[in-house]
Swiss-Prot record:
Annotated dUMP binding sites: 21, 126-127, 166-169, 177, 207-209
Listed SUPFAM superfamilies: Thymidylate synthase/dCMP hydroxymethylase
Gene designation: thyA
Keywords associated with the record: Cytoplasm, Methyltransferase, Nucleotide biosynthesis, Transferase
Source organism of this protein record: Vesicomyosocius okutanii subsp. Calyptogena okutanii (strain HA)
Name listed for the protein in its UniProt record: Thymidylate synthase
The reaction(s) this protein catalyses: dUMP + (6R)-5,10-methylene-5,6,7,8-tetrahydrofolate = 7,8-dihydrofolate + dTMP
Length: 264
């Protein structure tokens, strides 16, 4: 994950100081891209521990169209706790937009099912896209989507994915986002009988929070290790039937966790 450390170092060195919604303050840079060849290893950061249950269960939660944190909490995942209301609800966030986007006729559109169909039947399409940025529902969301838009691309029997992330917490959030969408690409490729290609991460406002500066220094002092590999143990009937136990991250060797506060 040298690409990630290079990114972290660049923003630390040339980013500009900005205030932000959380009143924490950030060092920020606008626009960056990283490319990971998924056939050469699974892009999990090794210079600190990435909590894999959070990555996997959150993705399954998105795919289920769920927007209540009970499922996450039942599986030991707490990353959405701070934004939920007293009933555990988050409003029409990712799960709703991925699986139940409402059109002007108030009909529900399942974007995930649609892209699976497109990858299988019209792989050369330039419209294999999922968007979570529903302008008409932003005000009802506990937190507007940070990773807002992703597109699939098929060439030479390989499936690639590019994500656009409008707001990128580089130290805490981006390692999770890279892992999550890389996992989704593997799942989609398996469902569509393709090999994996590249995962491309593209960021808008890429920032390091001011209360993460010490943690960033610690991480940059560490040497990245060889990447893990992903083993998917079975092929379910569809993209929605995977479970946590279906995934094994082989030879994930990592340094100690580095704790940091989340900006709310």
């Amino acid at each position: 994950m040298k690409q990630y450390l290079d990114f972290l170092k660049l923003v630390k060195n040339i980013g500009v100081y900005k205030t932000d919604r959380t009143n924490t303050g950030t060092t920020s840079m606008f626009g960056y891209q990283m490319r990971f060849d998924l056939s050469k290893g699974f892009p999990l950061v090794t210079t600190k521990h990435v909590h894999l249950p959070s990555v996997v269960y959150e993705l399954l939660w998105f795919l289920n169209g769920d927007t209540n944190i009970k499922y996450l909490q039942d599986n030991g995942v707490r990353i959405w706790n701070e934004w939920a209301d007293e009933n555990g609800d988050l409003g029409p966030v990712y799960g709703t937009q991925w699986r139940h986007w409402k059109n002007i006729k108030d009909k529900s559109i399942d974007q995930i099912s649609k892209v699976v169909e497109q990858i299988k039947n019209t792989p050369n399409s330039r419209r294999i896209i999922v968007s979570a940025w529903n302008v008409g529902e932003l005000e009802n969301m506990a937190l507007p989507p940070c990773h807002v838009f992703f597109q699939f691309y098929v060439a030479d029997g390989k499936l690639s994915c590019q994500l656009y992330q409008r707001s990128a917490d580089i130290f805490l959030g981006v390692p999770f986002n890279i892992a999550s969408y890389s996992l989704l690409t593997h799942m989609m490729a398996q469902q569509c009988d393709l090999e994996v290609g590249d995962f491309i991460w593209s960021g808008g406002d890429c920032h390091i929070y001011s209360n993460h500066y010490k943690q960033v220094e610690i991480q940059l002092s560490r040497t990245p290790k060889a990447l893990a590999t992903l083993k998917i143990k079975r092929k379910p009937e569809n993209i929605f039937d995977y479970s946590f136990e279906d995934f094994e991250f082989v030879n994930y060797i990592f340094d100690a966790p580095i704790k940091a506060p989340v900006a709310i």
